Amino acid sequence: MSVVNFYGQLSNTQQFDQIRINIASPDQVRSWSFGEVTKPETINYRTFKPEKDGLFCARIFGPVKDYECLCGKYKRMKNRGITCEKCGVEVTVSRVRRERMGHIELAAPVAHIWFLKSLPSRISTLLDMTMRDVEKILYFENYVVVDPGLSILQKGELLTEEELQKAKDKYGEDAFTASIGAEVIQQMLKELDFSKLKQELYDELHITSSEVKKKKLVKRLKLVEDFLESENKPEWMIMDVLPVIPPEIRPLVMLDGGRFATSDLNELYRRVINRNNRLKKLIESKAPDIIVRNEKRMLQEAVDALFDNGRRGRAAKNANKRPFKSLSDMLKGKQGRFRQNLLGKRVDYSGRSVIVVGPELKLHQCGLPKKMALELFKPFIYSKLELYGIATTIKAAKRMVEAEKPEVWDVLEEVIREHPVLLNRAPTLHRLGIQAFEPLLIEGKAIQLHPLVCAAFNADFDGDQMAVHIPLSIEAQLEARVFMMSTNNILSPANGRPIIVPDKDIVLGLYYLTIAFDNEVGEGMMFSDLAEMEHALYNKFITIHTKIKYRRDQLNAEGKMVPVIIDTTYGRLMVGELLPSNPNIEFKFINKQLTKKDISLVIDLVYRHCGQKATVIFADQLMKLGFKYACSSGISFGMDDMVVPESKSTHINETQLEIKEFEQQYSNGLITYGEKYNKVVDAWSRCTDRVANDMMKEIATPPVNDYPNHQKINAIYMMAISGARGSFQQIKQLGGMRGLMTKSNGQIIQTPIISNFKEGLTEFECFNSANGMRKGQIDTALKTASSGYLTRKLVDVAQDCIITEKDCGTDKGIEVKSVIEGGEIIVPLAEKILGRTAAIDIFHPVTNDLILNKGELINESKLEQIESAGLDRIMIKSVLTCESSTGICSICYGRDLATGTLVSEGEAIGVIAAQSIGEPGTQLTMRTFHIGGAATKGAEVSSVEASYDAKVKIISRNVVINSEERKIVMSRNCELLLLDNNGNEKARHKIPYGARLLVDDGDMVIKTQKLAEWDPYTIPIITEKSGKVLFKDMVEGISIRDVTDEATGIPSKVIIESKQYSRGAELRPRIQLLDSKGEVITLSNGLEARYYLPVGAVLSVEDGIQISVGDIIARIPKESTTTKDITGGLPRVAELVEARRPKDHAVIAEVDGRVEFGKDYKSKRRIIIHPIDGTMSIEYMVPKGKHVVVNEGDFVKKGDLLIDGNPVLQDILKVMGVEVLANYIVKEVQAVYRLQGVKIDDKHIEVIIRQMLQKVEVTDSGGTTLLVGEKIDRHEFDEINAKAMKNGLKPAEAQLILQGITKASLQTRSFISAASFQETTRVLTEAAIAGKVDKLRGLKENVIVGRLVPAGTGYFMDKMRKAAVKLDEENV
């Protein structure tokens, strides 16, 4: 017996390893066929039997009934294989009607519309004609010259009827040959000699210099090579014979009313057959040319409509004016074959029902209604009933089950025991949306769900439904139990934190239980055991909140029990009792008021130190305790719990005064409208926060009153602070003031809502708030779809990313450090490196001890060593640098977040990454509406304060002292560092240009001391010398104009875009500084004092006045701020992973060098950078209106911004390389999610980036057959180069290119996967011509062809099968 067969008989789908797609030749089509369809008839309207030679002919396609010929002469199995001599039908199973094909011999050749119209058109590219011209020939509009003969006509020239006639008159009838229709195209394609053509194209490519021509040649050359390699013949793109698909796939069914419903394809086929038969008759009867030609055109159109209706001209429509569904439409889109039937199938043994909460279930259980269980487990019940002899036959068993006899229920109980079922809640956004549970039979009709798994399913009990699926085979049950059991999915795969976390009322109950009140009954009593305390509690000597002392035995590090006395309360001890005993889990973790965060932390600790079983038991008990006390606490809230602070009116009055002042400044012309708007918005933001803070203080301190049973703590406050429900944002609106509202476009309305919900809103306020609320509702509706689409694209691009080996052996890695923003450490280093592996040996900086070996996993204990060593950056391995040829290795990926151990081989990390990024996107878009449109925007940062006592260090300090003796920063990249006594960096702040420095290098500062301040709403332009102002190129009305503010009537001079006027095109508005002699002053960097002003700048000086150092000559207003929420965020994530050019993108410097402004070109400014190493200078052309952030003579580093904005990803890759690009994308994507408090591990984003960097673009072909500009897979490129070097040829060179995820998915190695994603026809056309082979490596293609996916258990089956095949080959 061969080794392969040891793994069970291989099904059909597993007997092949790859699939190849080709263009079908006419001979192939005939060989598939079982006969020619010559009649358009379908079935006889009286007998309902298929017509002979028609579209449903039984002779061609097989019998209609199993083992029965059409006339009924032969029936039953005994005659199988006989062909009836009367009706010609073979006696066999009727299933063959799904498999057997027919064909139609076409009377005239017809072009295949996919190769003609799918862009770029393959036929026209090969013939080097335009598509319009080819169409004109095919649809009988123009003739084409095939052989110019003795005439001066060109080969391939098009002629109309008249031109042809003229040419014939001029040169004679037989002097040249011109022809029309598909025949001539077929002939031209036949005449192509590919090997010769290839050489010609190669030669031409080397001599041509035009880029456009090169591109065209490369395209054609690529196509020619495809044809050569795939052994397709080009004339096969024109068809002589048309395949007819099996009749069962285009069925004709009888409806109740005696009418028929038919597939559109039948109608389309009928048209083809009718026109074909008519054409045959016309040719036979030698009809006039014009009639034959018209019929040929009609035939071409009929075949077009069959293949791809509507692709060319008007779509063929049925009687109800609906276009017919053609063969292409059957494959395309969500309802097409790929997505509807191959990737997603409806399954048997499933049911769905409403869910209700099941608080008494254990974590691994779910309640299944008896009715559902009976239906789902029917086959199992039948076999058991028969086995026990309760029922004699299956039929008897069936009757018993239908009658619901008592024995049936006993059998059901037994069948169901330990047989896991899968529960799924749509939408399944990540893998935790399907989990396995052991069913418990319950009465009623609703499924019971354990409360702790709701977070993973994102389920609530307001009418949600869930589906139940039954794993049937023993392997499926095993997988369900081992991988999918809810108890095995405690940690979230997105961030490695527990996802089985108490929520809502459990949190509230636990918070209430662990509160300690002052002056409770029996405060300070001592206890030594719990029974004693219960006694005291029962007799009302203490309450659960009384502060008491307690002697508790605790495990120390040596594992011995030691008694300790702790200050605690009875409630906290009850939680403490549930803790598993472990020296690492100390009582102090729960000896406090437990909020949701604390509980999550404790569950995490228990999981890390005590393992999974202990965690599950602990979580379950915690839940029971929480529910109990949430109930007995009797927490509820009423109107009086919403406290409106006394100080509210004072704050509002103060702010209104402030705003009056801004209005005044504005009317006096001191500030622009934009500045006023920003200041007003800021003032109100601050006011809202102050009111909210006062309200929080009042809520947090309970009112003193005389009722003995009065609730000691505000219920609303308790719900929010414990993390049970609601946020301070919402409470602020209940009792503070609602604050500023946003318009639907994200702009903030200047007048805030001063009332809160308790006082009630005025009509006007209500109207204003409706705006923002509506935005939330609309967002939710629109964004959910786009988020789902993003997830789908991510899954598609990453689906073939699988862990394929333990270690790829690379030495590369990436350097990570903590994320610092605004001087605060937002993400500590620890968070970024936990669960990754070290790329190099890591030593202690002081003692030089080895902390980590290269390739060692960084776990919690190693983290502590790294933190105590004070390391601030570390080299870790990353999927970006992994060198596995297919998939990724475990070491580069690191820890599998869902288990906390090193990731195992066969794990589908790509899909997990896609889900981790996509799932929160969907959640977040649904979350906007809870706040109801209240603007959430922090006041603008306008100063920097010291966050520590420290020493100041200033980097790139370039300062001038102005007339007020203030230090003004003149450098564009000034940074202020705070250092501790050892010189370690504690904080880093960017100080903007034009800021006032309040400290200097080397100063010692104390915490909260102000270090620098600036105007946050404008970018100033500052002088560094004193002198006299001279305006240049400021022409009133062309480059500058007085803008009079309507509200104030005060004019100010503003620079405007001058290119609308012919004489304005050359103007470059600038200010020059002159010395006393009238000469232009020279600055410290040796350049003249000229200040160029961008469009929109507001002048602060007059022509001819004297100014001093550090004065502001002009201000550039910043745009008014809009609120940031995930709606700004989700499109931002999409923009990043699609690698789109951002709107108003930044321009970055490609080298280190000095900046010079060159001569302008039309409406563009020219920025030149002279590199320090004296190489060629680089020019950048930027639109004039853009604000350039560098000045003439500034020194810029490689990668610095020259123009503000978001940089283009492709530029970062080109200039700074992969690591910087990856860091940037990770940082930007994380920033979006961090804003919403969502945690995603960096490695997931890195996986997606790796998939975006799969391709390289050839820059030099060397000795290989690659073409310059060709885009090819990284690994394929390496393989080709390895071959070339082996043969002693020069290897090709290429550069990495970044592709958006949509493009990357469409260009995967697998055409099946690409076709099922988008643009199905284009992908299949391309694949067929190139004769592509799909190796079936990813998940999607395997699902489509119906095999186990090569991930998880399927990965090992696949591996073992391949090994077995190898063994068999060796044995042979």
Curated annotation (Swiss-Prot):
Family: Belongs to the RNA polymerase beta' chain family.
Gene assigned in the entry: rpoC
Known partners and oligomeric status: The RNAP catalytic core consists of 2 alpha, 1 beta, 1 beta' and 1 omega subunit. When a sigma factor is associated with the core the holoenzyme is formed, which can initiate transcription.
Enzyme class name: transferase
Catalytic activity: RNA(n) + a ribonucleoside 5'-triphosphate = RNA(n+1) + diphosphate
Essential cofactor(s): Mg(2+); Zn(2+)
Binding site for Mg(2+): 460, 462, 464
Cofactor note: Binds 1 Mg(2+) ion per subunit.
Metal-binding found in the keyword field: yes
PANTHER family on file: DNA-DIRECTED RNA POLYMERASE (PTHR19376), DNA-DIRECTED RNA POLYMERASE SUBUNIT BETA (PTHR19376:SF54)
Classification via SUPFAM superfamilies: beta and beta-prime subunits of DNA dependent RNA-polymerase
Gene Ontology CC entries for this record: DNA-directed RNA polymerase complex
Molecular-function GO terms, alphabetical: DNA binding; DNA-directed RNA polymerase activity; magnesium ion binding; zinc ion binding
Classification via SMART domains: RPOLA_N
E.C. number: 2.7.7.6
Main function: DNA-dependent RNA polymerase catalyzes the transcription of DNA into RNA using the four ribonucleoside triphosphates as substrates.
InterPro entries in alphabetical order: DNA-dir_RpoC_beta_prime, DNA-dir_RpoC_beta_prime_bact, RNA_pol_asu, RNA_pol_N, RNA_pol_Rpb1_1, RNA_pol_Rpb1_3, RNA_pol_Rpb1_3_sf, RNA_pol_Rpb1_4
Keyword line: DNA-directed RNA polymerase, Magnesium, Metal-binding, Nucleotidyltransferase, Transcription, Transferase, Zinc
Record: residues binding Zn(2+) 1: 69, 71, 84, 87
Gene Ontology biological process terms, A to Z: DNA-templated transcription
Residues annotated to bind Zn(2+) 2: 808, 882, 889, 892
Pfam families (UniProt xref): RNA_pol_Rpb1_1 (PF04997), RNA_pol_Rpb1_2 (PF00623), RNA_pol_Rpb1_3 (PF04983), RNA_pol_Rpb1_4 (PF05000), RNA_pol_Rpb1_5 (PF04998)
Name of the protein this chain belongs to: DNA-directed RNA polymerase subunit beta'
